[in-house]
């Protein structure tokens, strides 16, 4: 995980000159940077945050009632701490046949601030990956073994370990990373096109539905195929929904060679209704 965190920091800074000599500088910002205002109890805020997230997913499809979580939080065994300790994931089956896997807890209020006054909605984001339904298992148990879940889990842990990803995303719009621990879940016949020599896969973070760039209202941003950019009605601070897009090695090389310009170019190349979808079977955009 240490190598992954270092690689992520290097990746998000590429193409920006000396402005981002250390991505960790963002972590020195005060917790109440968004100037929240609330005197609700932590329990109230956790419940309101959970309901707001559920409302978004229910708008996009059929939300599985069973939450994907751990019997024992990875935090207790030395993993990154999520805002309220709880680490969970949700599964949504969409009318178009796709499936969404999403983190559920990165935007919980911090549990070490008992009152809402001065608290924020965690790291200010939740990640999701959308994939064709025929490329992922049917049962929750098998879903947790899928490459889609492993990629989502790795990126979520990465963000929790860093702590300041939201501020960087607000400034840079698109980030990219190379994720470990995903390659073994990918069918062997697809690894040559997706897994690099270090055993990692590339991912682009932050693609939005085409209508998001021009829509002023979060609750109008989702349509039959799109996912909203933000979660409405969070109790403390704004929370973004961040797409994870699996990259081919050729696409990852474009980013490695050209940095921020490469990420922007890929965003332009990923068009149409499959823009946000990750699949082992799609042709490379480059």
PLM features: what roles do these ranges have?
Residues 132-166:
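Compact, glycine/acidic-enriched structural inserts
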Residues 12-15, 159, 273:
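Short, flexible helical or helix-coil boundary motifs
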Residues 40, 44-47, 51, 146, ...:
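Alpha-helix boundary/N-cap detector
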Residues 4, 17-20, 276:
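Positively charged, low-complexity intrinsically disordered regions
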Residues 30-46, 126-142, 251:
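Charged, low-complexity surface segments at secondary-structure and domain boundaries
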Residues 62, 78-131, 167-284:
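Aromatic/basic-lined ligand-recognition segments
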Residues 2-10:
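Short hydrophobic helices that act as membrane-entry/anchoring signals
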Residues 10, 14-84:
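The feature captures two recurrent sequence modes
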